[in-house]
């Protein structure tokens, strides 16, 4: 049995949930983090000393794993043959680079908007900081749009781990009431993303 600790509105938890759903794997989710607590309990910290979600335990392989990208890579390798796993090291690297880019680049701009706009009361918002994050996101959207002019998915010809890493961020940014510069290729990717049942189930929830 696979057990996942994490709350549904966490961007990083969504990546793991999306992977589990795409692979149609049975799992138990234990809500944890922020208002749910648990992540600072001794039992949790014994498994993940960082005290963060997501955390995954796979009894079948006797594995406890944290860090969302590591979990997604593991699930794809362990259970995603002929689906999310790409046999070619070169093609796989092309997809996986977007996982690191999303965590190192896109997440920072996304965080400025999520925390500054969504999780901060109107009277306490720093509009200048929000505007700066919006400008940064718009530039990143241009980069993504240019990439998608060449490929169908960030993972190549098929949906894969590169798309899983980016999807929760883009969904949030497209659904917080902001207006963005039109990016036709990114919009095309987003539209085909929203047609996937797993995305509808675990990614397309109210942004909070």
UniProtKB/Swiss-Prot annotation:
Give binding positions for glutathione: 12, 39, 53, 67-68
SUPFAM superfamilies reported for this sequence = GST C-terminal domain-like (SSF47616), Thioredoxin-like (SSF52833)
Q: What class of enzyme is it?
A: transferase
Which reactions appear under catalytic activity for this entry?
RX + glutathione = an S-substituted glutathione + a halide anion + H(+)
- What EC number(s) are associated with this protein in UniProt? 2.5.1.18
**Keyword terms, alphabetized:** Transferase
Q: Where is the GST N-terminal domain?
A: 1-83
Is Zinc tagged as a keyword?
no
Task: Name the GO cellular-component terms.
Answer: cytoplasm; cytosol
Which stretches make up the GST C-terminal domain? 88-208
**Mutant phenotype after disruption:** Mutants are hypersensitive to bromoacetate.
One example of the protein's molecular function in GO is: glutathione binding
Q: What's the stated role of this polypeptide?
A: Conjugation of reduced glutathione to a wide number of exogenous and endogenous hydrophobic electrophiles. Catalyzes the glutathione-dependent dehalogenation of bromoacetate.
Q: Which family does it belong to?
A: Belongs to the GST superfamily.
Name of this chain's protein:
Glutathione S-transferase GstB
Give me the gene this protein comes from.
gstB
